[in-house]
């Protein structure tokens, strides 16, 4: 896949950039990825990361990583570390050093003073609730604060008192003086600064007033020389304030903001607030639970950087909000793992088979391919003995004409091996089948049986070639396509989103994994034949108990001939 070519051909933002570069030959493309360090990155952030960094590469420009760290109440160093790790994991490197909006706090304070001196900002003492009430609605204009017409000198002095910590939290704020009757609610005297008494992870206790996102963002873009500030559609109205602040301060550089649709994924929730509810209620294990689309969760589930970037390329960049099929994301990783995953056999729900015509010392070795279509991936050895395991779902006691696997009185072929015939079953005290007694036809290795009818094939593992393992079978967390739109999204939790199985993998394969278990950065992927694609779960695995996460099943349901999306209002 030529990602750059795809971007250039399909991206409407490229048309804007091409026009800008043609009109100004001296212009260098300069963008940024500006996350708030208040949570973990998800698949929606990946779309923005890929867009900004790929555009910077395409136009031989630069892409900064800047943390918009203007709210110390919600921010944490652990999020900064996680975000940097995720960006590097995706294969991108930001320009120069990591930047922080907090590096510009003094300059931002000076810009705020400029607005006050121009009569374009004032210190207000209304509470949050009163500000919301005074703001009005889409149908009714707002009304002026009683503190709106203070003198410039009074506002200068009050803002300085805010900076010195003379007011308590919520007692005062700095607001832009624009138009309380504006058709755009965001322009109705928005708050520019508020008071927060808490230690900041970068500036410590130097500041107790903090700029709002809208004030800091545009000015940080200007300070860094950003040419194209790309954001999602929910910030479309914020552009009015973005441009107003730049126009009314003494900035020397004027970046331009452009909006594209955010990524909305079927059966998924991206809201940090809602994910936290799921965690607090113990519905999911944490921010890296493979049932949610954070990057750490997708990585744990077995998604690769290239599969995520391929997905972001396929969905493209538009101005229309759509609900993207989850099967498209699965298609991207399935297509990759089909080429790269080692083939091996695993038994998730074991049932024992005793081959009565083979003695207890019988042992035969088979050399099998690690990949049927790629000899360069090598081979591995499996052993065949008189006692083996098959999956419980591959046997049926009662006759069923439509059932094509092993049945009592019928035959089946073992993968890479012989045809066996089920003759008798043994049950435990609870009535569950504990053993299947079978006859092994040793004349059928690579040959048809005497009746010339080839039976179906099932996978198996010799009892002497097993290593116990846990298997986590993940499904969608929600049973409706758009849980984000539901007021009570908890009503739509899929109770079968995680099923745990305990069985076996091939011993030699397992022993190789155990040697690497201490290195969490090693990615190991398998196709468990006839089951699906799995990866090792380095978080839950121990040396004496391996845990595998199902990345995706074998069956592809996405129609690659067209990009299927649904209007976001549809469920």
From Swiss-Prot:
Sequence motif 'HIGH' region, location on chain: 35-45
EC number: 6.1.1.18
MF-aspect GO terms: ATP binding; glutamine-tRNA ligase activity
Disulfide topology: none
Catalyzed reactions per annotation: tRNA(Gln) + L-glutamine + ATP = L-glutaminyl-tRNA(Gln) + AMP + diphosphate
One protein family per Pfam: tRNA-synt_1c_C
Domain of life, source organism: Bacteria
'KMSKS' region, short sequence motif: residues: 269-273
Subcellular location: Cytoplasm
Coiled-coil residue windows: none
Residues that span the membrane, as ranges: none
Signal peptide: none
Positions contributing to L-glutamine binding: 68, 213
SUPFAM superfamilies, per database record: Nucleotidylyl transferase, Ribosomal protein L25-like
NCBIfam families: glnS, PRK14703.1
Family: Belongs to the class-I aminoacyl-tRNA synthetase family.
Protein's recorded name: Glutamine--tRNA ligase
Species annotation: Buchnera aphidicola subsp. Acyrthosiphon pisum (strain 5A)
Gene symbol of the encoding locus: glnS
């Amino acid at each position: 896949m030529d990602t750059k070519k795809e971007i250039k051909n399909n991206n409407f933002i490229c048309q804007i950039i091409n026009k800008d570069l043609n009109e100004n030959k001296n212009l260098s493309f300069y963008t940024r990825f500006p996350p708030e360090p208040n949570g973990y990155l998800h698949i929606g952030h990946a779309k923005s990361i890929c867009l900004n960094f790929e555009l910077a590469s395409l136009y031989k420009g630069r892409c900064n990583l800047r943390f918009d760290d203007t709210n110390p109440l919600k921010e944490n160093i652990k999020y900064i570390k996680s975000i940097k790790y995720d960006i590097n994991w995706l294969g991108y490197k930001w320009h120069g050093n990591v930047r922080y909006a907090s590096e510009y706090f003094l300059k931002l304070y000076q810009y705020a003073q400029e607005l006050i001196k121009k009569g374009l900002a004032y210190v207000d003492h209304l509470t949050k609730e009163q500000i919301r009430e005074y703001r009005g609605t889409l149908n009714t204009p707002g009304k002026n604060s009683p503190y709106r017409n203070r003198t410039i000198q009074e506002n200068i002095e009050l803002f300085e008192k805010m900076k010195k910590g003379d007011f308590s939290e919520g007692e005062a704020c700095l607001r832009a003086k624009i138009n309380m009757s504006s058709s755009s609610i965001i322009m109705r005297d928005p708050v520019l600064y508020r008071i927060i008494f808490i230690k900041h992870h970068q500036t410590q206790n130097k500041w107790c007033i903090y700029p709002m996102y809208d004030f800091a963002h545009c000015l940080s873009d200007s300070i860094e020389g950003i040419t194209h500030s790309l954001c999602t559609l929910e910030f479309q109205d914020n552009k009015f304030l973005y441009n107003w602040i730049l126009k009314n301060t003494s900035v020397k550089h004027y970046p331009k903001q452009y909006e594209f649709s955010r990524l909305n994924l079927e059966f998924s929730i991206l809201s940090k607030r809602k994910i936290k509810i799921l965690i607090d209620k113990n519905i999911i294990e944490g921010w890296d639970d493979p049932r949610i689309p954070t990057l750490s969760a997708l990585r744990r589930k077995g998604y690769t950087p290239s599969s995520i970037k391929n997905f972001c390329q396929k969905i493209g960049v538009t101005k229309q909000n759509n609900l993207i099929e989850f099967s498209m994301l699965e298609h991207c990783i399935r297509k990759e793992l089909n080429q790269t995953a080692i083939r091996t056999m695993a038994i998730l729900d074991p049932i024992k088979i005793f081959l009565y015509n083979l003695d207890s010392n019988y042992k035969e070795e088979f050399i099998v391919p690690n990949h049927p279509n790629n000899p360069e991936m090598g081979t591995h050895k499996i052993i065949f003995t008189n006692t083996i395991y098959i999956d419980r779902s591959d046997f049926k006691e009662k006759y069923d004409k439509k059932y094509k696997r092993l049945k009592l009185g019928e035959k089946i072929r073992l993968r890479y091996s012989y045809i066996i015939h089920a003759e008798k079953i043994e049950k435990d005290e609870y009535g569950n089948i504990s053993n299947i007694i079978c006859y092994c036809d040793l004349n059928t290795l690579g040959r048809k049986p005497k009746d010339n009818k080839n039976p179906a094939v099932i996978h198996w593992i010799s009892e002497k070639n097993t290593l116990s393992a846990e298997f986590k079978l993940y499904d969608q967390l929600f049973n409706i396509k758009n849980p984000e739109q539901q007021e009570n999204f908890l009503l739509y939790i899929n109770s079968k989103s995680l099923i745990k199985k305990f069985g076996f993998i091939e011993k030699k394969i397992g022993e190789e994994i155990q040697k690497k278990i201490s290195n969490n950065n090693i990615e190991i992927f398998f196709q468990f034949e006839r089951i699906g694609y799995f990866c090792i779960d380095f978080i839950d695995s121990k040396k004496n108990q391996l845990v595998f996460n199902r990345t995706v099943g074998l069956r592809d349901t996405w129609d690659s001939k067209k990009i299927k999306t649904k209007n976001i209002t549809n469920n």
